[in-house]
């Protein structure tokens, strides 16, 4: 046998301990090398980051230093531009005085609502007048409603520093007296009308039906003369307005009245906000002291010069001609001193007026720290809801004795107690067998055509004892929006009204303020339900358009120019409320900003509004309460508005900066845009990228226009309620 063949392949070589240690050492060296490289890379990156941060900080500090260096200069220039606000207020004061003078020389017999004696005389004389028909009362009501409106505007438009507490009480008492007397006159006129019910009876039904319509009041009255138990459905001719009355009323000597007043004289008057006047009064006292000091200094200087000249004239009698010439010089000096005194007084008066205006503007954006008094479940909180479309006074009345013809005369028994209400249901029901003898009365009303309800209206009734609106005692409410008819069942008759959430259009989804022409802008506010466009020019505002769910709504207010405060009231009464109150933040989730920052932003936006467009930015939600962010661009008539070139500005009240981010960016950053600087005002911020023509237009803006734009911005509070 030959030798054995060797196995193919050899055994795996065994790794020695030394080799294993060597491998581990190599692995460790590689790991350490990688760690060292990573450390060096991190240190390098960190050094680069710190270097960039240092450079940025140095740049930031340089920009801050530059901003501080020119701050006083910029603020002085802003102060001169903002003189338009006290100038506009001065024009308002002159307009009010001119209005009083025009009323005085007009001599039309109507009283001056601001003079208590004239108002008391007017009320007393009208009280003494008797036997007025409904048509006569309606005609007189136009004068009365105008007086009430004037008194309300006095309370709203007069600066609080010019309103004394006794004046506020006087005006509010006059309003209440006029409201009560007007309603009393309507009741007396209704009684006179019902005395003639038998002569006005319908030939078919035998009952009396009367409808009297006016711009402010509509009367529907039905007298049950036949007492037919089957005649239980009352519908006024050519309308769907009416009642479904129970059998007991159909067989009673009663009349049913629906008096629809297109105004609300039932709800309590809103209290006039009277902030602490310490700031304004202290400023006033300071200015008065300055004026007195200036006058004393000037008069002392003139007196010393006069004494010195008199002494010289006694010593040198022979130089009489020279003395006379010097006396002329003194007279010139005295004249120039008086002119200087007047100029200083005027400047100081403007200063205190500016302080007053600023305090009033700040009041418009201040939030109340305390929520209104607690309301029961069935009570209506009029800080949360608002009445719309006026008040429907529903009354069941006892039919008064009817006129009877006797030998060519009309004889009527006049009850001493006057018009009496029929109690339904009666206070005691023991004499009646069935439980449902007094069911609720079904009522169908027409909603006022000039009012917008974004949701189905709520029906509420007036509680005369508690002096508030309530939701109980009303059932089976149904609303037909196309016909504008609302039907409901009412346990007891009395005043009813329709209410809507006052903040239904808050918060806003977006807004834009855009120039239209010289001293004319368009403010657009977009909400969940509507888009409202308002034009502003000089001291006037106008509703330009209202869009509801992609369709245009025609409002009676469109095309009517009004001053800001009456305009705001008119929009609220039409259901277009985009004007928060100091209590609104309790009912709306808002992006609350510091009041002083808001005021400064609105004032400076108004100054620039004749040339620059402003718009809503989503980043305003992400910055804190001490800063506001919005879009801005110079408005060029020929530019394409599809893709406007907006700049993002952030403003803290003391500093304005242009942000690096855009509206489409993914995250918020306060980083400064390259090659831009800090400024103390919005005016100087936009001047960096605006044309000379634009800035010239800003400087020549009409003071009343700027003031009106500012008032509208303060009233809508776009930066907090968007």
Swiss-Prot record:
Location of this chain's protein in the cell: Cell projection, Cilium; Cytoplasm
Keyword Cytoplasm: yes
Chain residue ranges for the region called Disordered: 1-20
Pfam families found in the cross-reference section: Casc1_C, Casc1_N
One Gene Ontology cellular component annotation held by this UniProt entry: axonemal dynein complex
Membrane-crossing segments per the record: none
GO molecular function annotation: beta-tubulin binding; microtubule binding
Biased composition (Basic residues): 1-15
Keywords: Cell projection, Cytoplasm, Ubl conjugation
InterPro entries reported in the protein's UniProt record: CASC1_C (IPR022110), IC97/Casc1_N (IPR031826), IC97/Dnai7-like (IPR023247)
Post-translational modification: Ubiquitinated. Ubiquitination leads to its degradation through the 26S proteasome. Ubiquitin-proteasome-mediated DNAI7 degradation occurs in mitosis.
Record text on subunit structure and interactions: Part of the multisubunit axonemal dynein complex formed at least of two heavy chains and a number of intermediate and light chains. Associates with tubulin. Interacts with microtubule.
Function: Via its association with the multisubunit axonemal dynein complex, is potentially involved in the regulation of cilia function. May act as a cell cycle regulator.
Protein family according to the UniProt entry: Belongs to the DNAI7 family.
Protein name: Dynein axonemal intermediate chain 7
Biological source species: Macaca fascicularis (Crab-eating macaque)
GN (gene name): DNAI7
């Amino acid at each position: 046998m030959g030798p054995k063949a060797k196995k193919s392949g050899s055994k795996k070589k065994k790794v020695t301990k030394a080799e294993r240690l060597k491998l581990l050492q190599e692995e460790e060296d590689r790991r350490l090398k990688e760690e060292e490289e990573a450390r060096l890379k991190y240190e390098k990156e960190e050094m680069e980051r710190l270097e960039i941060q240092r450079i940025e900080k140095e740049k930031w500090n340089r920009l801050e230093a530059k901003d501080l260096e020119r701050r006083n200069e910029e603020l002085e220039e802003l102060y001169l531009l903002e003189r338009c606000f006290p100038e506009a207020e001065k024009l308002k004061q002159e307009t009010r005085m001119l209005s009083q003078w025009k009323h005085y020389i007009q001599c039309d017999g109507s009283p001056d609502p601001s003079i208590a004696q004239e108002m008391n005389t007017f009320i007393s004389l009208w009280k003494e007048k008797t036997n007025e028909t409904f048509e006569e009362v309606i005609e007189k009501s136009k004068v009365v409603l105008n007086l009430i409106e004037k008194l309300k505007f006095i309370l709203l438009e007069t600066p609080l520093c010019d309103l004394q507490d006794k004046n506020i009480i006087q005006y509010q008492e006059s309003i209440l007296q006029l409201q009560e007397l007007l309603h009393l006159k309507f009741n007396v006129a209704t009684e006179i009308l019902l005395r003639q019910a038998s002569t006005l009876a319908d030939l078919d039904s035998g009952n009396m039906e009367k409808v009297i319509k006016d711009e402010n009041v509509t009367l529907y009255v039905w007298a049950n003369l036949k007492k037919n138990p089957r005649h239980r459905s009352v519908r006024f001719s050519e309308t769907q307005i009416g009642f479904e009355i129970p059998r007991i009323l159909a067989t009673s000597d009663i009349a049913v009245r629906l008096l629809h007043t297109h105004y609300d004289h039932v709800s309590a008057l809103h209290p006039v906000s009277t902030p602490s006047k310490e700031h304004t009064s202290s400023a006033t006292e300071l200015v008065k002291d300055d004026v007195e000091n200036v006058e004393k200094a000037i008069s002392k200087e003139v007196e010393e010069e006069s004494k010195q000249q008199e002494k010289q004239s006694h010593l040198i009698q022979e130089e009489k001609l020279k003395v006379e010439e010097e006396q002329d010089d003194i007279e010139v000096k005295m004249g120039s001193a008086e002119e200087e005194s007047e100029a200083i007084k005027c400047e100081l008066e403007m200063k205190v007026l500016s302080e007053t205006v600023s305090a009033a503007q700040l009041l418009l954006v201040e939030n109340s720290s305390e929520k209104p008094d607690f309301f029961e479940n069935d009570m209506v909180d009029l800080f949360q809801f608002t009445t719309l479309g006026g008040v429907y006074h529903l009354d069941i009345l006892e039919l008064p004795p009817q006129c009877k013809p006797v030998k060519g005369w009309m004889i009527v028994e006049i009850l001493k107690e006057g018009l009496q209400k029929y109690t339904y249901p009666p206070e005691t029901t023991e004499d009646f067998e069935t439980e449902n003898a007094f069911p609720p009365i079904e009522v169908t009303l027409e909603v006022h055509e000039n009012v917008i309800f974004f949701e189905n209206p709520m029906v509420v009734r007036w509680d005369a004892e508690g002096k508030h609106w309530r939701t109980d005692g009303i059932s089976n409410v149904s609303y037909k929006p196309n016909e504008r008819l609302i039907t409901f069942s009412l346990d007891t008759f009395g005043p009813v009204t329709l209410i809507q959430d006052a903040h239904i259009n808050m918060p806003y989804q977006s807004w834009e303020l855009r120039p239209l022409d010289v001293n004319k802008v368009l403010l657009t506010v977009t909400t969940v339900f509507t888009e409202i466009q308002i034009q502003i020019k000089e001291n006037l505002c106008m509703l330009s358009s209202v869009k509801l769910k992609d369709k245009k709504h025609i409002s009676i207010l469109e095309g009517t120019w009004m001053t800001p405060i009456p305009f705001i009231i008119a929009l609220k009464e039409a259901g277009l409320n985009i004007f928060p109150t100091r209590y609104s933040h309790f009912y709306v989730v808002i992006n609350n900003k510091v009041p002083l920052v808001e005021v400064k932003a609105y004032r400076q936006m108004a100054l620039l509004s004749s040339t620059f467009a402003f718009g809503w930015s989503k980043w305003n939600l992400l910055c804190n309460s001490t800063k506001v962010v919005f879009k801005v661009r110079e408005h060029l008539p020929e530019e394409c508005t599809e893709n406007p070139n907006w700049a993002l500005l952030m403003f803290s009240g003391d500093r304005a900066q242009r942000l690096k981010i855009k509206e489409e960016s993914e995250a918020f950053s306060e980083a400064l845009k390259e090659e831009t600087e800090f400024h103390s005002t919005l005016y100087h911020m936009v001047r960096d990228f605006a044309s000379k023509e634009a800035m010239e237009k800003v400087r020549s803006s009409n003071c009343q226009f700027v003031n009106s734009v500012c008032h509208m911005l303060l009233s809508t509070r776009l930066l907090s309620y968007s």
